[in-house]
Amino acid sequence: MKSMNRMKVIRRITTLVMLFIIIFCFAVTGFDMNVIINRGSQAVLFIKRMFPPDTGYCGKVIEPLIKTVQMSIAGTFIGAVFGLFTAFLYAGNLIKKSYVRIVVRVIVQCVRTIPVLILALVATFIWGLGAAAGTIAIAVSTWAVMARIGGEDIEGLTLKPYEAVTAIGAGKFKAFSRTVIIELLPGYLSNSLYVLEANIRHAAILGYVGAGGIGLLLNEKISWREYSRVGMILVMLFVAVLVIEGISIFLKAYLDGRIKRNTTANVIISVCIMVFFVYSLSAVKDVSTSKLGIKVVGAIMHGITHPDWEYMFMTGKSGVMYL
């Protein structure tokens, strides 16, 4: 009876604390529902200006839209491949040396906390403006996400086949590729497709920081208030995302066995995927690092290893704690 009363008290205290945090956040951010209600008509007016879209502008949208899709596919593929092998080091049941696992997990978690837009901004400083920087940013972001997902999936697997192969003298990496990857791959590929769907949407805004794709065109037309062309860009982007998600749903159903599989279908799908990937690599064909880019990397690493702790504990509006 006492334990039940104690739980009720804890739940009430937790509810009150959460309400206090929510109210505090509203107060600090200056959230005002009246502003949203009073200016809601502006949002409706903005949408009305976009429709009907300027269909004559369709031809100008195709090239940057294709570039956006290329960035997404190439970045997701590269990130997923590297993430698969990083998952081997991330998983606690495969790597017995705790310091290796801890270092890998810290790096992965640190990268995961950085939004892909910030990664793209940093990439433009290093590799210059264009789709190459966007592709690299998506690849790094995907690598971190898939390394964690893959590592956690590995921890949920039974490792008896892996242990049996290592027991007969095979190396850990060989045993991993012959046993764990085979069992892990269907679920890993399905998760990669989910990440690809998200990356298509991420890639659409990377142009705002000069990382190529349709975002650059979208930013330009919004700035010039050419709303009918903005509408055309959004319609074509919606269609592209819809097509990619349709293909993704089909491939996930194929991997899950909901669609009948055979050798011919496996070969055709594998060839199509490789063709799309090779074609998408044209998005990074001009990647190069200048001397300035190397200096930027050095400056970034110096900033990471020598943080300004005073900025961390500043109480003003420019301090990290307030932001």
Q: Model features per residue range: what roles?
A:
Residues 54, 68-76, 107, 111-117, ...:
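Loop-to-transmembrane-helix entry motif
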Residues 76-88, 92, 117, 187, ...:
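Hydrophobic positions within alpha-helical transmembrane segments of bacterial inner-membrane proteins
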Residues 108-142:
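Generic hydrophobic transmembrane alpha-helix motif, especially the helices
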Residues 85-120, 149:
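Cytoplasmic-entry segments and transmembrane alpha-helices of multi-pass inner-membrane transporters
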Residues 214-251:
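Hydrophobic alpha-helical transmembrane segments of polytopic membrane proteins
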Residues 58, 62, 66, 96-103, ...:
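Alpha-helical membrane-protein architecture signal
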Residues 129-195, 202, 246-249:
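Membrane-cytosol interface at the C-terminal ends of specific transmembrane alpha-helices
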Residues 1-73, 77, 246-323:
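N-terminal, non-cleaved signal-anchor transmembrane helix
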